[in-house]
Curated annotation (Swiss-Prot):
Keywords: ATP-binding, Cytoplasm, GTP-binding, Hydrolase, Magnesium, Metal-binding, Nucleotide-binding. Residues 160-327 form the OBG-type G domain. The keyword 4Fe-4S does not apply. This is GTPase Obg. It comes from Deinococcus geothermalis (strain DSM 11300 / CIP 105573 / AG-3a). Belongs to the TRAFAC class OBG-HflX-like GTPase superfamily. OBG GTPase family. Its cofactor is Mg(2+). It is found in: Cytoplasm.
């Protein structure tokens, strides 16, 4: 399967089912009471991190995901079934961004972790809900609310315990193959590795293991998008321990400076990670030159381990050093997960706009109209769109309890003025407050 670590998708949660407007019917009962049931909740869209998946490629064929709607309520107080939640399985290390706001909406760093990224709509209430001592046969019910829709960008940042970073042809793939059971493409030319490759490294006694990633070779300017650029730097941010793989036959100290410059430019916190230096291809130089290079690298304050991926020299020591230095996985995950930004549920503030409409007949006074926006009133009107006339009394009492009439009075509304909320119009009476 091809490797893909960025994917744009669209998700839509299910709509809530409408409540039922129904009355009980029986053979010997001419006028039964209201018995409309509630609509079901719409299904939500949920991201779920699973094992055994290392790429977003499996989602490429389906870019749009829609959860089922809730079922309508029915008579005899039967509630509509909830829509099933839709799960999108992704690799551990997947981050989801809202493409419109750019905010982080999910960051899945553990197997089994879930996050709702589009919430299903609420089911509407049936007419049985609206019975009162003075309203014993309500001929209206509530509509379900729409499910959330979102444009989402998925970015995979592989969660490997150890990341091998270095310039092209430094021997990272050979080192990964020598230490683990991975089988990367290996050749003596740059950019053999074009996507991250994971391997599993076991301790000498086979009791412990960790994952190691061969990250594609860095070039100067990678943090600005040159070469493979951000396509691989993203994955380095997830590793608990960095191994700088340097070719002893080149200029290791200068290459390490450039590597750290690129990492610092992309994300300064990367240089705070636990790290060591694997001085590779040690079989190609004599002992004196190797010792001199080690002395030059001492200024960086990192452990230096001379190794040869080709002959196996120094590999047992490198393996043990990695096990000794690895930070605790759970503690690291808790402190390095991206912070999900809380959902903002902000209700638009109430605003009243006054206008005068031209009279229908010459000589008549213009119609005084108050437009109502915000305060949640428009959303409530929409939920009774099919039965606005029958629900007028209920809505009028609801708006009174929620302070609309007091707000109109303070704004200067007069007896008989028209109040307009979307398509719903009614007359204002001073005694309503």
């Amino acid at each position: 399967m091809a490797f893909r670590d960025v994917l744009d998708i669209e998700v839509a949660a299910g709509n809530g089912g409408d409540g039922s407007m129904s009355f009980h019917r029986a053979k010997y009962l001419e006028k039964g009471g209201p018995d409309g049931g509630h609509g079901g909740r719409g299904g939500s869209v949920i991201l779920r991190a699973i094992e055994g998946v290392e790429s977003l490629e499996r989602l490429v064929g389906q870019r749009k995901f829609k959860a089922p709607n809730g079922a309508y309520g029915e008579g005899r107080l039967r509630q509509g079934a909830d829509g099933e939640d839709l799960y999108i399985d992704v690799p551990v290390g997947t981050t989801a961004f809202d493409r419109d706001s750019g905010k982080v909406i999910a960051d899945l760093v553990r197997v089994g972790q879930e996050k709702v990224i589009a919430r299903g709509g609420l089911g509407g209430r049936g007419n049985s809900t609206f019975v009162t001592s003075t309203r014993q046969a309500p001929r209206f019910a509530e509509l379900g609310t729409p499910g959330e829709k979102r444009r989402v960008r998925l970015e995979l940042r592989l969660i490997a315990d150890v990341g091998l970073v270095g310039y092209p042809n430094a021997g990272k793939s050979s080192l990964l193959a020598a230490l683990s059971r991975a089988n990367p493409a290996i050749a003596d030319y740059p950019f053999t590795t074009l996507s991250p490759i994971l391997g599993v490294v076991e301790s000498a006694d086979g009791e412990k293991r960790f994952t190691m990633a061969d990250i594609p070779g860095i070039i100067e300017g990678a943090s600005e998008g040159k070469g493979l650029g951000l396509e691989f730097l993203r994955h380095i941010s997830r590793t608990r321990l960095l191994v700088y793989v340097l070719d002893v036959t080149r200029d290791p100290a200068e290459e390490l400076r450039q590597l750290q410059t690129e990492l610092r430019t992309y994300d300064p916190s990367l240089l705070e990670n636990v790290a060591l230096i694997a001085l590779n291809k040690i079989e190609l130089v004599d002992a004196d030159l190797a010792a001199m290079v080690e002395d030059e690298l001492a200024e960086f304050g990192l452990p230096v381990l001379p190794v040869s991926a080709k002959t196996g020299q120094g590999l047992p020591e490198l393996r043990q050093a990695l096990f000794d230095l690895l930070p605790d996985r759970e503690l690291w995950a808790r402190t390095h997960a991206l912070e999900e930004e809380p959902e903002e549920v902000r209700e638009e503030p109430l605003t009243l706009t006054f206008r005068e409409d031209a009279p229908e007949k010459p000589g008549e006074a213009p119609e005084r109209v108050w437009e109502v926006h915000g305060g949640g009133f428009e959303a409530r009107i929409v939920r009774f769109a099919r039965h606005l006339e029958d629900a007028a009394e209920y809505l009028s009492n609801l708006f009174k309890r929620q302070g609309l009439y007091n707000a109109l009075k303070r704004a200067g509304a007069r007896e008989g003025d028209t109040v307009e909320i979307g398509s719903f119009r009614f007359e204002y009476y001073a005694d309503e407050d």
